[in-house]
C-alpha cells in the first residue's frame, strides 16, 4: 500500500514548505499540548458548539482547568462532525488524513470505523509524535503517520474510500491538492474539508484575515477558490455548511483562557465582521 519513505528534500520542495515545516516542528503551544493532555487526543483544529455554562461555576482556582477541558471537548466535537460526514466506512476501507498534525482525528476515525488510516504531514516532529500515540494505543498496525507532502503522497491510485483535511488547505495550492485527492479516491469516494476561508463578497482580504495568515505562516484562500478547484478535479459537493456561528463560542472561551495565543481577537473580529468563514465542504469523487 505504501512506497519507500521519501527524503526531506523530496518532501519539502519549496522555501514556503520548508518554513511551514519548521514552524510546526518547533511548535509547542500550550493550547495544543495542554488540551491534548486531558484525554490523550491531540488536536490541531478549533472547536464547535455551545459552551457548557457550568465552566463558569465553581471555585475560581479551578476555573482555568474547567476551561481547558471544555475547549478540548469542543475540539473533539468538531472532529466528530467531520467524521459524521465521511459516509459509510467499513473496517476494510482505507482513509487518508491530509495534514494530520499530532494524530487526534485519525485515531478517532480508527476507533469509530475500525479501518486503516494513514496520516501525512510535512512536520517530522508531528509525525513522530502521532506515531507514538498510535503505538501507545496499540493501533500502530492500523493507524500510521508519514512524513510526506499531501500534494504527492505516494499512495496508490484509487486506494482511499475517504479523505479529509481539517484546517490544512491554507498551506497548499488547492488545484494541486484536490488533484492528488481525486487520484487517491476510488470512484464514489468522499472528501471532507473543514477550513477557514475569506469572503469574496468583501473584496480584498481584511486586516484581521491578514493577521491570521501572518500568525500561522499560511495563505487563506477565498471561498470561491475551493469550488473552482473541486470542479476542476471531479470532486462534486453534496453538502456545504457554514460553521462560523458554531465556532465563535469556542473562540470567546479561548480568549479568556490561560492558553490564549493572541490570535483570538483577529479570529473573532474576522468572523463577526463577515470577512472570514469557517466552512465544511463535503464532496464526492465522480
Regions found by a protein language model. Name each.
Residues 239-260:
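Conserved catalytic loop of SAM-dependent methyltransferase domains
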Residues 176-190:
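A short glycine-rich, Lys/Arg-flanked "PGG" loop and its adjoining helix->strand segment in the class I
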Residues 52-58, 72-91:
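Conserved alpha-helix/loop element of class I SAM-dependent methyltransferases that forms part
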Residues 151-163:
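A short acidic, Gly/Pro-enriched loop at the edge of an enzyme's catalytic core
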Residues 1-42:
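N-terminal auxiliary segments of SAM/dcSAM-dependent transferases
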Residues 218-234:
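Short alpha-helix
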Residues 196-217:
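Short, glycine-/aromatic-enriched active-site segment of Class I SAM-dependent methyltransferases
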